[in-house]
Amino acid sequence: MTLASAPAATESCNSFIPPSFDVNKVEIISDRPDCATFIFTDEDHTLGNALHYVLMKNPKVDFSGYSIPHPSDNRMNLRIQTKSNITAQESLLQGLTDIKDISRHIFETFNNALDQ
């Protein structure tokens, strides 16, 4: 199952995913709504560590962990377990939104410092 075809997240994903994003880049392995493994193709520690950090700041997330199966393998596995009032897919989308907001803040702060 890909991120865009996941039943619980289809509507919210389509409003978040930019048109240029390859939805086949993320595969979801899940048997419960509150627990899932997301396999990202062509991603590494940069996204994995950032997502793990912001997910663990979310009080609705019980567990987050990522791994790179092998250095020559171009995949990153992210495991998320949430409390029952939010799905793992919703917490992933919130985490990606948080990273985007943090990046925007850093960019604006840096540019403002350059302008001074």
Swiss-Prot record:
Q: Which family does it belong to?
A: Belongs to the archaeal Rpo11/eukaryotic RPB11/RPC19 RNA polymerase subunit family.
- Grouped into one coarse class, the protein's main location is nucleus
Give the subcellular location: Nucleus
Provide the alphabetized UniProt keywords: DNA-directed RNA polymerase, Nucleus, Transcription
Q: Can you state the subunit structure given in the record?
A: Component of the RNA polymerase I (Pol I) and RNA polymerase III (Pol III) complexes consisting of 14 and 17 subunits, respectively.
Extent of the signal sequence: none
Q: What does the entry give for GO biological process?
A: transcription by RNA polymerase I; transcription by RNA polymerase III; transcription elongation by RNA polymerase I
Q: What is this protein called?
A: DNA-directed RNA polymerases I and III subunit rpc19
**Primary gene name:** rpc19
InterPro entries with a match to the protein in the record: RBP11-like, RBP11-like_dimer, RNA_pol_Rpb11_13-16kDa_CS, RNAP_AC19, Rpo11-like
User: CDD domains, from UniProt?
Assistant: RNAP_I_III_AC19 (cd07029)
Q: Does the keyword DNA repair apply?
A: no
Tree of life domain: Eukaryota
A GO-annotated cellular component: RNA polymerase I complex
A Gene Ontology molecular function term of the record:
protein dimerization activity
The answer to keyword Nucleus applying to this record is: yes
Question: What PANTHER family does the record point to?
Answer: DNA-DIRECTED RNA POLYMERASE I,II,III, DNA-DIRECTED RNA POLYMERASES I AND III SUBUNIT RPAC2
What job does this protein perform? Answer: DNA-dependent RNA polymerase catalyzes the transcription of DNA into RNA using the four ribonucleoside triphosphates as substrates. Common core component of RNA polymerases I and III which synthesize ribosomal RNA precursors and small RNAs, such as 5S rRNA and tRNAs, respectively.
